[in-house]
Regions:
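N-terminal glycine-rich FAD/FM-binding segment characteristic of electron-transfer flavoproteins
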Residues: 1-192
Length: 192
């Protein structure tokens, strides 16, 4: 059993939101007396995650996955969940995570709540922002596998150094995943 997290990165650098996810997952793992396992794609120095409570990194190095589709990421994460016997998967509030989390929940027949602003209770009830953050919802997840999407800036990063193991991970992806290809990702800048 483990808490699995997907680490958002850009140009090989771990994003700030990934440290929030790691801090949140560490708090859950401490309650459940288990480990935190992170999945990284093309991150040359995943050791930085040890400072935020990550025990193990499944490190994927594959230039073909530089720009990854939600479907491909879904297949990759399914294999990571199975490999680590993960019962909880935590995502940030990134657009990529918001696209893949529902796909993964459907594939694993898992319960999914997004925009979470609290740690789960013992009965696995979580608070989440709804209606443009004007209301709070209480949701209970009672499926064997639970997928959690954090609200942006809901958790302060907190350092908790642990021993880290980095393991190469080479998931087998179906041929159909290579038919969908993300050519580029563009970010808006300046005034909108």
């Amino acid at each position: 059993m483990s808490v699995l997290i997907y680490i958002d990165s850009e140009n090989g650098k771990v994003k700030k939101s990934a440290f929030e996810v790691a801090t949140y997952a560490r708090a859950i793992a401490d309650k459940q007396q288990t480990k935190v396992v992170a999945v990284t794609i093309n991150v040359p120095q995943p050791e930085v995650l040890a400072a935020y409570g990550v025990n193990k990194v499944l490190s994927i190095t594959n230039d073909q996955l530089q720009h990854i589709s939600a479907n491909t990421l879904n297949h990759l994460l399914q294999q990571a969940v199975a490999k680590e016997s993960s019962t909880i998967v935590v995502f940030s509030a990134s657009s990529q995570a918001k696209g893949v989390a529902p796909l993964l929940a459907n594939s694993l027949q898992a319960g999914y709540v997004s925009n979470i602003i609290s740690l789960p209770t013992e009965d696995f009830i979580v608070k989440s922002n709804v209606f443009s953050n004007k209301a709070i919802s209480l949701s209970q997840i009672n499926t064997p596998i639970k997928i959690l999407g954090l609200a942006p800036n809901a958790f302060k990063t907190e350092e908790k150094n642990v021993e880290l193991t980095v393991e190469p991970f080479a998931p087998t992806l179906p041929d159909s995943d290579w038919g969908i290809q993300v050519i580029t990702t563009e970010k808006t800048s300046g005034k909108v």
